[in-house]
Amino acid sequence: MRTSQILRRASIAQTCADAMIGAVAGLALYSSFPPLGWWWMSIPALALFISRIDEARAPRAIGVTLSFGMSMWLPLIDWIPMAVGTRAAWFVLAFVQTLFLCAWVVFVRWTSLWRAARSPLAQALLYAISWAGVDAARSRWPWSGFPWGSVALPQVDSPLGHLAPVGGTSLVAAAVVFIAVLLRRSCAGRDGAVAPEHRFSRPLLALSACVLVVAPAAIPLSNEAEAGTVRVGVVQGDIALPGAQAYSHPGEVTGNNLRASRALAADPALVDKPIDVALWGEGSVDR
């Protein structure tokens, strides 16, 4: 067998292995969202994904990203077929969201050409800021955007969630990615950006990642009531079961919630003390 054939087969095997690892990382990131809600999986999942793309050429990095993105998005938005009545929209939406990830990967691979961007801190900053930027972009475009799936959302019950009052979901998402890069660099088999004499660099990066995960817990979250009160009404319009049957008739779910809202507004018990706002549940609008 010729050397070229051996190298070609080795390259194909490496590409397949990277794609499989990307899929595992995508499923691991999915597990950080409900219903599993393992928020702590976000960081190792992203670190594993980053380890497959930060030293790969652009074509291979994009291939890994497609595997990672589709593995995360498809199970995360498995409710789409029920909502719109077709599986095609499910795959298209997952693919479009994955394309945003691909754009991010192309950008960060381009920044790796800069020598100054190869140090652990610089890489972490670039990856974190650009990830938060892509998150913000896909939350607003196309049309009104799709903010679902931000890596900030699983951190509600984690120490990193304490950053939300300071900088919103953008800061939380950036923090998750920043820590993930530090974790990835602490586990790197070889790292040309770290001088050989810095033998404690990797343990220091790992320690820094751990500290950054728990440090935001020191930020106090105020639970004091603001001046005045707000009377809130909760509306549950109900739907026919199975759910797909209700969503297959446009306007049925909205109509049910509208009738329940009118009944709530007409409740004699609320004449003297009317509510200030009525809350509808998620998925209450189907038109």
Task: Report each predicted region and the residues it spans.
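Soluble catalytic regions of membrane-associated enzymes that act on cell-envelope
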Residues: 219-287
